[in-house]
Amino acid sequence: MSFLKFAYRNSWRYYSKSTRHFHKIPIRQFIIPTSIAFYLTQNSFPKQNCLIYNDSLKPDPKGDTFEMGLYVSSENELQEKLKSFRSAKITESRNKLIRYLRIFWFGFNDNIVEPVCTILRFLEISAIFLPLLLLYPISWFGHKLKITDTNITETRGSLIWCQLLRKALELAGPSFIKLGQWAGSRTDIFSHALCHELGKLHSNVTAHSLSFTLEKLSQALKVDKIEDAFDEFNRTPIGVGSIAQVYVGELSQKYIDKYDNIQIGKDGNRWCAIKILHPNVRSQIRRDLKIMKFCADAINWIPTMEWLSLPSEVDQFSILMNIQLDLRIEALNLERFNENFKNSIQVKFPKPFLPLSNRDVMFEEHVYGLSMEKFLSTKKQINDVELCKKVSDPFVDAFLQMLILDDFVHADLHPGNVIIRFVKTNKYGTNIISSELESYRITHDLRKKIEEDQDQDFVGKLKSVLTNYTPQICFIDTGIITELNEKNRINFIALFNALARFDGYRAGELMIERSRTPETAIDKEVFAFKVEKLVDKVKQRTFTLGTVSIGDLLDQMLSMVRSHHVRMESDFVSVVVAILLLEGIGRQLDPNLDLFESSLPILREFGFKREAKSLLKDASTLSMLKIWVGLEVRQLMHLSMKQIYDLVRTDQLCPNY
């Protein structure tokens, strides 16, 4: 600094007043001060962080659950944006005539164009479903047939009609495909045969154009071309759904370093899955929902059909669809799941890239693994219950944590949405010591053997991997979650409490009292006695571990609910269906699975976490603790004295606690 001052003070020596130019300056006197000055200007001021932001979303306090809060906030934002857009369009012109023309056009579009488009769509849907409605009488004819791999029996005509309905729903478009998938889970309303057939629904939607994808990606990433953001981008979608399609790409390190708020995981995985909504899908779904609402209101006028509460069911379905049309909600669901399972080694949810995601595009960490569907298909060839339990145990525990501890349940737990990765942990199972590359290579080798039809080699390799590595259960596609509000949670725990105490009659009464329309239920006492008989049948068993199937119990209850017109809350039914799916997958892996026993560690954690709270102020907590105590007593009744001694010795049972 002193040398710089000296050079500055002596600079007059090289200046000519007559020519007003500097004389030739010695290089030493010029370069060194200039370099110092440049260094100081570069380091005297803090660098500004460069951030990237897309549309953020926060839950609205008016929502009674986390996801409902996000939904309310999303809908309000959509209305505000539409209002602001139209206001800006009207006021941007100073010409009064143009302003009035634009006001006229907006009104004309809302009151003429949109209704006409909806009517045309209604005619299209009528052409698809009206012939099917006329063919319904065929379901009364034909011999009774049993559906393969199930206990469901139906007439041949009914099975044919169900197949035709599935084809019609696929033909009708994304809204009706989603409607069919939703109806397939509602065994409390529709027959088992119909629900089984609707479970086969898949999308026949054609992938949207690559140019549309590139445009949406450029907008989200704030780049002119995607090569500026990706090292590699697979231009062929890996999945095309009824609402969106999914691509895979690797974000460049240069792009990540450019923004301070893009954070990747500790493993450095820059591969991401990108979900992009189809063009014009919102307008089509909006029209379809209006048509469904009209049809539901019409059916509700038919005598004896009020118990279905179809208008309110369509309202719930509309919320479900609109939630899936804002991909930020799915990204925020992922963030919450990651927070809930942040301490888990064997359960993983993809990390969302919230700064890059918006209403139409969602970025999340790409999970490369083996699908649960493929694992279940090879279970018989593995023929080792202990190895299969290494997969089933964390899967069941994860679901029970969602249900009991977090009250935030993944509501679409079919095998296609569960992926298995393989990691190596330390001897205590507390840390992952294998790299992301090692996990990728293991999965890649397994998938390569599947593609090459090397079944024997695949099974042998899989058994070796299961023996030497720890399975990590990964859940994807979290767009639909179930979260019970306070009222529904209390109702669910009260029912579960009655079932755990094997008070069947009380369980039946609760199902009617706390249903949506108690007045429409028929033969209420008969229904309660049926539930009591069902529970007593379970109670009379020896209660050997594995003989009590809560899934069978709930499935039969849903059948009785349907026949007695007991309308359950949709969130409640979603939890029941999730339990059925869980036990269905779990028992394929472990035939001796008992959810009552599996829930004990979670209930213990539930009790210990809340022991510092005032339990008397929380009825749901007290009910859950009663269930815990009851199940602990039930388990102790089956233990030998030696096993009890082992529990005390290992501090799993504390008599003086």
UniProtKB/Swiss-Prot annotation:
Primary localization class, coarse: mitochondrion
Transit sequence range: 1-15
Subcellular location: Mitochondrion
Pfam families (UniProt xref): ABC1 (PF03109)
A biological process term (GO) from this entry: phospholipid homeostasis
Top-level taxon of origin: Eukaryota
GO CC term, one of those recorded: mitochondrion
SUPFAM superfamilies: Protein kinase-like (PK-like)
Keyword Transport attached: no
PANTHER family per UniProt: AARF DOMAIN CONTAINING KINASE 2, AARF DOMAIN CONTAINING KINASE 2 (PREDICTED)
Note: Present with 2470 molecules/cell in log phase SD medium.
Protein name, per record: ABC1 family protein YPL109C, mitochondrial
Organism in which the protein naturally occurs: Saccharomyces cerevisiae (strain ATCC 204508 / S288c) (Baker's yeast)
Lineage: Eukaryota, Fungi, Dikarya, Ascomycota, Saccharomycotina
